[in-house]
Amino acid sequence: MNRLSASERQAALRELPGWLELEEREAIGRSYQFKDFSEAFGFMTRVALAAEKADHHPEWRNVYRTVDVVLTTHDAGGVTERDVKLAKAMDAIAERCGAR
């Protein structure tokens, strides 16, 4: 899969509210806030299932009710359409899980 150009990444980010291009590497990132740890963990569980099905996995960390996510396609050396698709799926899952 080919890396997205800078203009393609910017266009994709316009359709992904809350997602930002990371300065330190070619990746996109976002933080999600939930009511509590259980909601955050439920979100991560649902994303894990979707990510496994897509064979594309996020870099993430969880502290209590916050989940920080970074997406990049390591094989391509940057952001690809796979990252954009997973970001959209994560946003939909987050909404269903009560993200604030």
Curated annotation (Swiss-Prot):
Entry similarity comment: Belongs to the pterin-4-alpha-carbinolamine dehydratase family.
SUPFAM superfamilies the record matches: PCD-like
EC main group: lyase
Single GO BP term: tetrahydrobiopterin biosynthetic process
Molecular function GO labels: 4-alpha-hydroxytetrahydrobiopterin dehydratase activity
HAMAP family linked to this entry: Pterin_4_alpha
Listed EC numbers: 4.2.1.96
Keyword Magnesium: no
Catalytic activity: (4aS,6R)-4a-hydroxy-L-erythro-5,6,7,8-tetrahydrobiopterin = (6R)-L-erythro-6,7-dihydrobiopterin + H2O
Protein name: Putative pterin-4-alpha-carbinolamine dehydratase
UniProt entry keywords in alphabetical sequence: Lyase
